[in-house]
Design a protein with these regions (language model features):
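Carbohydrate-interacting/catalytic domains
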Residues: 1-127
């Protein structure tokens, strides 16, 4: 993560000087490190993010029309893969600016926002 390969697009045959892990980048990018660590913990805590079969995904995964090619949003529903959460909405904005789109009606609990993860969040967003 955040590895500097010195511009080498395919470092498979490059020496260790190119492929080594620069641990100083972890400290420099601490916010990103903590965010990814939180995402991993969220994935481990919720079976819905670990659906093992294509059939399971087809049953529970529904993509939303965001009207923006830079925004991906989907729901995982009906306690997917035995999850404790009835329905999960995931939205990722790959744009530099804010995006707006309609989400399904529900009282959503916001667990992840602006690079911060709080599984015990009490922040809500109506759909």
């Amino acid at each position: 993560m955040m590895q500097d390969k010195q511009g080498e697009p395919n470092s498979f045959r490059s020496p260790d000087a190119v492929n080594r892990i620069d641990w100083a980048l972890k400290a420099k990018n601490r916010d990103l490190f903590d965010y990814v660590r939180g995402l991993i913990a969220l994935r481990k805590a919720h079976p819905a993010f670990r659906i093992p079969t294509a059939e399971g995904l087809q049953q529970g995964l529904h993509f939303l029309d965001t009207g923006d090619s830079g925004v991906i949003a989907y729901t995982l529903g009906e306690y997917a893969n035995g999850d404790a959460w009835k329905e999960i909405l995931v939205a990722y904005n790959g744009n530099r600016q804010q995006a707006e789109f309609h989400i399904p009606e529900a009282d959503w609990t916001v667990v992840c926002r602006d690079g911060r993860i709080d599984p015990g969040s009490r922040d809500h967003m109506p759909g």
